[in-house]
């Protein structure tokens, strides 16, 4: 099963390496990883997506908490949460399809960052499923030249916060 794990850790050199090392030495795969400082510059928030049984994820969480830099760990998968990814996509549109490309971008809630003749760079923030749908849709309007996307970001709904 796919799991989203949020981790807060001290913003120290080597902290991310130790987290990634924990996964690699145990043979677990990280499907996506996003990390950035929080409102406290000494603490970073890491959001990672991995797969495994509930028992495996529970074990991973306990192992993460043993790392000296880790402050908090939460598997947000089964809790109510918001989850988003960011997509940047470059498309070469056929002249007859430019209007359709603009319409699809607006319907999806995206934004055209660059429009030059037949080349478009589009930004979209949405769920993984919506981003996958959008990529498939715009491929009908021309050639997809480049796709860049960040890993999943997640935050729990309501007042509950991850320890920092």
PLM region spans:
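Long, contiguous binding/interaction regions
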Residues: 1-4, 8-44, 49-164
């Amino acid at each position: 099963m796919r799991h989203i794990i949020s981790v807060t850790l001290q913003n120290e050199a080597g902290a991310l390496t130790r987290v990634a090392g924990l996964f690699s030495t145990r043979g677990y795969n990280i499907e996506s990883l996003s990390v950035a400082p929080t409102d406290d510059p000494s603490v970073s928030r890491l959001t990672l997506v991995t797969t495994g049984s509930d028992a495996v994820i529970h074990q991973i969480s306990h192992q993460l908490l043993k790392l000296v830099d880790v402050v908090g760990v939460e598997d947000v998968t089964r809790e109510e949460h918001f989850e988003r990814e960011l997509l940047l996509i470059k498309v070469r549109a056929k002249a007859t399809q430019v209007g359709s490309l603009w319409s699809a971008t607006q319907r999806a809630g995206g934004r055209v960052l660059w429009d030059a003749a037949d080349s478009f760079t589009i930004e979209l923030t949405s769920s993984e499923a919506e981003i996958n749908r959008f990529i498939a849709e715009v491929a009908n309007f021309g050639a997809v030249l480049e796709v860049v996307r960040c890993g999943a970001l997640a935050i729990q709904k309501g007042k509950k916060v991850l320890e920092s």
